[in-house]
């Protein structure tokens, strides 16, 4: 018998680290002029139309088995991984689908790109939900559609955040895939075999958002753009780092050191972003990960306090110094002198 997961308690447990649903200023996006690099969009659109993964997400016989042999804690952590991944993919589907609908008259090229990206995200979410079904559970995507809460971002911020989200998704998937190709004994479930082609969807989506950013030079070329790029790089990296610090046991179960994994993903994503953003973070500065480690410890302590049976007022007093320390460490990271990536935009990596 399959149990449907509706996440009715989500509003009570939602944090800054929870996958979110976004909306934006559709009129501003509709008025964008993409003539600066229109040929790039035609090339990307042809890539999307080719639909290289149309036959990739097909479940084979290897899925038709019992997963009761998985250790209980590992199974629980893996299901949570599937749920979070499915929610994130579904969030992307809803945003891209709405953008394609709103832009189809004013900017048909961009609208079709969003439509085809929504196809990919829906495919990913459906594949993940089928995997959840192997554990007699199902994420209620219809319920999510009806009850989702939107976070508003202006188009510029949507571009920064989603570009980084797609690129970091690429590096997360390909890093896990390569690890499991080398150590197949850690492949606890066949979905990991799909990550090589899967991550190429993420990479193409990231390239699309890179083209959008380049089509609007003012999103990249002034001092405010540099400040915002630093902010979004730090936000995306810190969110992943703090999330994964809570899930060390899951990464251990698939043979990965979560800290080393995150460091690799952050370095690679930072390198990718340096080809688009005017600045990159100095992730090789020893203080960078030192401060991130402190943030992760602060966040873990905050979670531990929430698990205690103390009175709300007592918890508030216990949390206050931890929040202050976490915020201070994030500010310290932000203030580390960034790398001027504009100076190396023509460097071949």
UniProtKB/Swiss-Prot annotation:
BP term (GO), one: light-independent chlorophyll biosynthetic process
Classification via SUPFAM superfamilies: Ferritin-like
EC number, as in UniProt: 1.14.13.81
Gene Ontology cellular-component terms listed: chloroplast
CDD domains per the UniProt record, alphabetical: ACSF
Listed InterPro entries: AcsF, Ferritin-like_SF, Rr_diiron-bd_dom
CC cofactor: Fe cation
Pathway: Porphyrin-containing compound metabolism; chlorophyll biosynthesis (light-independent)
Subcellular location: Plastid, Chloroplast
Molecular functions per Gene Ontology: iron ion binding; magnesium-protoporphyrin IX monomethyl ester (oxidative) cyclase activity
Swiss-Prot/TrEMBL keywords: Chlorophyll biosynthesis, Chloroplast, Iron, Metal-binding, NADP, Oxidoreductase, Photosynthesis, Plastid
Reactions it catalyzes: Mg-protoporphyrin IX 13-monomethyl ester + 3 NADPH + 3 O2 + 2 H(+) = 3,8-divinyl protochlorophyllide a + 3 NADP(+) + 5 H2O
NCBIfam families per UniProt: AcsF, PRK13654.1
Annotated family: Belongs to the AcsF family.
Task of the protein: Catalyzes the formation of the isocyclic ring in chlorophyll biosynthesis. Mediates the cyclase reaction, which results in the formation of divinylprotochlorophyllide (Pchlide) characteristic of all chlorophylls from magnesium-protoporphyrin IX 13-monomethyl ester (MgPMME).
Listed name of the protein: Magnesium-protoporphyrin IX monomethyl ester [oxidative] cyclase
Gene name linked to the record: acsF
